[in-house]
């Protein structure tokens, strides 16, 4: 999938339409609003403090440098989900990408996360990425279920590797799979509930 395929309209399971688009600098204020509105529970173990201007500056720079590609999902004109593909452009892990996915609680369970991840997996294939990984902690039960449905499986568990914003330690779970397997699983899932797709 090339950038020209976005924005597009995705039909969710509840019949609503979400607009998917590549994140741009013009989305800065909305992205901060989205992340600052997340509950502390949801932000507790995120890899970065996504509520700060410093994080946003670094995120936008990663987009400019091609080290990250982000897709935002909007419902009723407001961001309700965001997914990012991170990659290393040089070195021995340049064939590996990392996906991070966050969906507002009000929009969960309707397939928005799948719709956000789908174009990123296609972009990973187009850019020669062979393997995708996702990091989460042991308490993120919903995240584990989501990534398992997307075709990921647990490859490693690192005890006490993550310290949350309150200083409590958590086990880090590393989920991964070959991009081709993830793509096949996602296509099968999308075929179950998305008979068509409208683009604009």
Regions found by a protein language model. Give the residues of each.
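Glycine-rich phosphate/pyrophosphate-binding loop shared by adenosine-nucleotide-utilizing enzymes
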Residues: 16-18, 76-82, 170
């Amino acid at each position: 999938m090339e950038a020209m395929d976005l924005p597009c309209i995705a039909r969710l399971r509840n019949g609503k339409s979400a607009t998917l688009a590549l994140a741009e600098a013009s989305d800065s204020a909305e992205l901060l609003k989205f992340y600052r509105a997340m509950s502390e529970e949801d932000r507790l173990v995120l890899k970065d403090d996504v509520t700060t201007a410093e994080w946003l500056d670094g995120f936008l720079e990663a987009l400019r440098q091609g080290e990250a590609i982000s897709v935002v999902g909007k419902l009723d004109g407001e961001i309700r989900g965001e997914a990012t593909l991170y990659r290393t452009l040089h070195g021995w892990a340049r064939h590996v990408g990392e996906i991070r996915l966050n969906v507002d609680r009000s929009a969960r369970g309707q397939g928005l996360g799948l719709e956000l991840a789908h174009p990123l997996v296609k972009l990973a294939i187009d850019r020669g990425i062979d393997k995708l990984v996702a990091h989460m902690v042991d308490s993120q039960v919903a995240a584990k279920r989501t990534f398992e449905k997307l075709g990921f499986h647990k490859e490693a568990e690192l005890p006490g590797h993550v310290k949350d914003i309150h200083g409590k330690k958590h086990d880090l779970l590393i989920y991964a799979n070959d991009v081709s397997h993830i793509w096949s699983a996602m296509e099968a899932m999308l075929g179950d509930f998305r008979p068509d797709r409208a683009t604009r």
